[in-house]
Amino acid sequence: MILALDVTDRDEALKIAEDVWEFVDAIKVGYPLILTTGLGIIRELAEFAPVIADFKVADIPNTNRLICDQVFEAGADAVIVQGFTGRDSLDACIEIASEYRKDVFVVSEMSHPGGAEFLQPAAESIAKMALEAGAFGLVAPATRPERVRKIRRIIGDKLTIISPGVGAQGGKASDVIAAGTDWVIVGRSIYKAESPKEAAREIAEEIQAELRGEY
């Protein structure tokens, strides 16, 4: 399970990470936290789990190189980038990641309703491009397990799929795992819970039950 830590307070972020680290495989940070705390929070959170920088990098190749260099220099283990900018922009991100021996996840389709408007028609082409380019993985929506299943058929077992949208957006961990995702991404259902630790524990138990075939 990946924790989407979309809070805007450094102390809160570190407290939640400390509370839930035993139940998560990675922590995903994005603009809400980075813009208020700076890139330095990445190394602090890395004390608890590997950090994925969710910047959805989407620019020309040179700018992508500059962004990814800063992300990995700050201590991130992976970066999330957009695929719709094309192969040369993606190659630039993978080039920098390889220099740091880090990973790139490519967004194939986002989890909100609008993700089906423009990204969904291109998602399968993006998945094929990510595979050919040598990306580490793809982002596919937990809110639409059938789409995860479709993407998995395209890439086989060659790429890792991570799926946002579990919990507050309506996705169910067991459903999307059954569809072929490797890691679910959970945010508000954990960090807005009265007890983030207990919320993380419950979701982790649901995931383990699905993996054992109990659902």
Curated annotation (Swiss-Prot):
Q: Which UniProt keywords apply?
A: Decarboxylase, Lyase, Pyrimidine biosynthesis
Family, similarity comment: Belongs to the OMP decarboxylase family. Type 1 subfamily.
Which residues participate in substrate binding?
A: 6, 28, 54-63, 111, 164-174, 187-188
Record-linked SMART domains: OMPdecase (SM00934)
Q: What is this protein called?
A: Orotidine 5'-phosphate decarboxylase
Keyword flag Protein transport: no
Catalytic residue positions: 56 (proton donor)
Enzyme type, top EC level? lyase
Subunit: Homodimer.
Give yes or no: UniProt keyword Lyase: yes
